Amino acid sequence: MASSSMASAASGFMVATPNIATSNTAPRTSMLFFSSSKNNTTTNFPRLVVRAAEEAAPPAATATAEGEAPPAKAAKPPPIGPKRGTKVRVLRKESYWYKGVGSVVAVDQDPNTRYPVVVRFNKVNYANVSTNNYALDEVEEVK
């Protein structure tokens, strides 16, 4: 076991905080100092000094040039798949719930997702699971 304790480790810890200036434009500097109290007999103490400076942020542009219009936001694409809560029938033949009806829990709007439609059923399958993901062409809305 190590013979040092947290008290001796904390005895060589010093934090120097910068003086608070009234001006916001002055850069701030912080200093953190660690020293080891193990080798008090030698003059070559191992130590770690960390300095961090925070520069003032450049002022934001407040005025726009004349004739320059703000960029128009792109219109959202229409949502894909059935809406949440819609009753759907499963068309995947290998599914436990084939031709069964369940309700849509969520639809992933990413077009690269293979099975974006999450459907929840009232009955559970052999693994005690009541939800499954399906592709858009594997479900049809029930009216």
UniProtKB/Swiss-Prot annotation:
Keywords: Chloroplast, Membrane, Photosynthesis, Photosystem I, Plastid, Thylakoid, Transit peptide. Residues 56-75 have a biased composition (Low complexity). One of its GO terms (biological process) is photosynthesis. Signal peptide: none annotated. Gene3D superfamilies: 2.30.30.50. It is found in: Plastid, Chloroplast thylakoid membrane. GO terms for cellular component: chloroplast thylakoid membrane; photosystem I reaction center. It comes from the Eukaryota. Residues 1-51 form a transit peptide. It is a peripheral membrane protein. This is Photosystem I reaction center subunit IV B, chloroplastic. The keyword Ribonucleoprotein does not apply. It comes from Nicotiana sylvestris (Wood tobacco). Belongs to the PsaE family. SUPFAM superfamilies: Electron transport accessory proteins (SSF50090). Residues 56-86 are annotated as: Disordered. 2 isoforms exists (ratio 1:1). With or without the N-terminal alanine. Stabilizes the interaction between PsaC and the PSI core, assists the docking of the ferredoxin to PSI and interacts with ferredoxin-NADP oxidoreductase.
